[in-house]
Amino acid sequence: YSFVFLRPLGLRLIQITLAARLEKFNLSSLAALTATDELNLPSLGEKKVALFALIPDNDTSFNFLVSILYTQLFQQLFYLADYKYGGSLPVPVHFLMDEFRNVSLPEDFSKILAVMRSRNVYVSIILQNVAALKALFEKEWESILGNCDEFLYLGGNETSTHKLISESYLGKSTIDTNTYGKSSGRNGNYSTNYQISGRELLTPDEVRMLDNRYALLFIRGERPVMDEKYDILKHPNIHRTEDGGA
């Protein structure tokens, strides 16, 4: 290792930095968790598997573990697709990335997102608002949105999100306006004026005021859809969940 030939001060600095980065792995519980490979990550692309990574939303101390998991999964699945299955996994893998803002992601996540679909790997990014995405990817947030073929808006109270949906996703609608005029008197007359004008399909304020029963769905190449949200309590398997009394 070349660093051993550095000056004592430089070597000491490297050792301190390394010790700080690996400090949490001194915990016996964490060391036991990461000592051996029990997940067989490539198998997720070869058979149906549900893998849950649960993290607390009020404590980010160990969120780096999920970051490591994501990084290794992307690497393993891409390698498997490219070198064993000719570029596409036999079983599609779908990442449901809740708490997206609280998890450290690979630095090249934007590039990963752009090339994953051809390998039968998909991701659903779940965020409170667009501002959170801008905070995470200041220069690449538009590219990330552009690489998502579907955008589902469930509601919110953040201004830049309302504006983006109104101006960039919904577009404008056409309004037909008829104006009638009538004047009385000896030479009274009657006139009609027909005019076509445009306005936002929904203004930012109307997006903000969206009824909580509804959601807005945008699919690439299709018209926007406003539809009722699905009531999860009506799902036929709800009795198997904690919400259903299991």
Language model region names:
Residues Y1-V121, L136, S197, D205-K229, ...:
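P-loop NTPase motor domains
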Residues L113-L216:
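Conserved ATP-driven motor cores of ASCE-family P-loop NTPases powering translocation/secretion/packaging/pilus
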